[in-house]
Design a protein with these regions (language model features):
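Short linear loop/turn motifs
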Residues: 157-158, 214-218, 267-273
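Noncatalytic regulatory segments and standalone regulatory/sensor domains
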Residues: 303-307, 313-314, 320-364
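Pocket-edge structural micro-motifs
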Residues: 45, 126, 291, 336, ...
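Predominantly the structural core of cysteine protease catalytic domains
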Residues: 230-319, 323-325, 363
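Active-site-adjacent structural segments surrounding the nucleophilic cysteine of cysteine proteases
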Residues: 169-251, 293-295, 300-305, 310-314
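Sec-exported extracytoplasmic/periplasmic mature domains
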Residues: 197-206, 218-222, 254-262, 282, ...
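Long, domain-scale functional regions
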Residues: 173-177, 190, 279, 284, ...
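Extracellular adhesion/carbohydrate-binding repeat motifs centered on closely spaced tryptophans
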Residues: 1-172
Length: 364
């Protein structure tokens, strides 16, 4: 006999009615997504389950604890540190937190130690804080700029850091770089500056010819309207021309380097003490300098007056490339575009360099 309080679904057997099933499904749907319960946020799947662990929700990464609660702030997961914003989203890239800078990889892991980012090197302490200024790391001193990038191959005040970023207290006693010389003549009878630049560029792996640089990138002008600080006076291909100083050579070099998509640049070191150039050689970088022919005493023949300024007209000014030195022997090694690879007295070269305005250019 059928009891009056029993309910049978269509098709036979006791169970939920269609209306009850619809009610349950509707309840599940209302639970899907983020829900705040007792002050904490949880995420429910479409079937009503509370999710836990790593979850990607609408393209954002979250971490939900074992209890399903959304995590915010710092969180150590599998021995790695992550940071989640107030909204629970995992942070990546550069982030400033409580006044300190951190870097999180694409996977969200906080960086520590050395890290290369967008072509620059940075250092992060054990707690992930980006370092700046002078830092002693594994027994060596390094300098990091205000933005945190490691400084290399340059002077920081009175201290030199090499291409690895390491502070060099004193350059080696003897250095000799393997620099191939190029002669300026016959094509460029007056082109010692642009030929010296070509020597330096070739050393750094740029297959460029002296004539190409001279014709296409070297600023030029006449001695009546152009100073040697602005451009080459005349044309290096002409015997009746003069010379230029460091600035036009830097312009020439950087115009070329930009045209070939290089990240390297020429730096005008004019004013740098001669002995400080030895650090660059010790760092593997030849240096273009201005001196005199055979390091003889400077000789002039009148002056130029351009733009309200007076310039001595040197008749034995010469540009060459420093390729090494030997302190004990008082020698510098030079790639001279007029005579080839030669050596001069270091002490004499120091004086001539100063007399010619302490002009120097380096590629780095």
């Amino acid at each position: 006999m059928l009891k009056s309080n029993s309910v049978y679904a269509a098709g036979g057997g006791a169970g939920s009615t269609p209306s009850r099933t619809a009610h349950v499904e509707a309840k599940k749907k209302t639970q899907a997504g983020w829900k705040k319960q007792n002050g904490k946020w949880y995420f429910y799947s479409s079937d009503g389950r509370k999710l836990t662990g790593w979850q990607t929700i609408r393209g954002k990464r979250y971490y939900l604890g074992k209890d399903g609660a959304k995590r915010t702030g710092w969180k150590k997961i599998d021995e790695k540190m992550y940071y989640f914003g107030k909204n629970g989203v995992m942070r990546t890239g550069w982030k400033r937190i409580n006044g300190r800078k951190y870097y999180f990889g694409k996977n969200g892991v906080r960086s520590t130690g050395w890290r290369k980012i967008d072509g620059k090197k940075y250092y992060f302490g054990n707690k992930g804080v980006m370092r700046s200024g002078w830092r002693l790391i594994e027994g060596k001193w390094y300098y990091f700029g205000k933005g945190g990038a490691l400084r290399t191959s340059q002077w920081i005040g009175n201290y030199y850091v090499n291409s690895k970023g390491e502070w060099v207290s004193q350059p080696s006693d003897v250095v000799r770089l393997n620099v191939k010389n190029i002669l300026q003549r016959p094509e460029l009878p007056m082109g010692c500056e642009v030929t010296s630049l070509t020597i330096a560029l070739n050393y750094h792996g740029y297959n460029v010819a002296k004539g190409y640089l001279s014709d296409n990138y070297l600023p030029k002008g006449s001695s009546s309207s152009t100073s040697p600080d602005e451009g080459f006076l005349g044309n290096p291909r002409s015997w009746s021309s003069w010379y230029c100083y460091s600035a036009p050579i830097v312009t020439c070099a950087n115009s070329y380097l930009e045209s070939v998509g290089s990240d390297q640049r020429a730096t005008d070191l004019t004013g740098t003490k001669f002995d400080n150039l030895l650090y660059l050689l010790d760092d593997g970088k030849p240096v273009v300098i201005w001196g005199t022919l055979s390091m003889g005493s400077p000789r002039t023949n009148g002056r130029w007056y351009v733009g309200g300024r007076s310039y001595p007209r040197y008749i034995n000014l010469h540009c060459m490339v420093l390729t090494g030195y030997d302190k004990k022997k008082d020698l510098v090694y030079v790639a001279d575009p007029l005579v080839g690879n030669v050596s001069y007295r270091l002490s004499t070269t120091r004086v001539r360099y100063a007399q010619m305005g302490s002009q120097a250019v380096v590629i780095r």
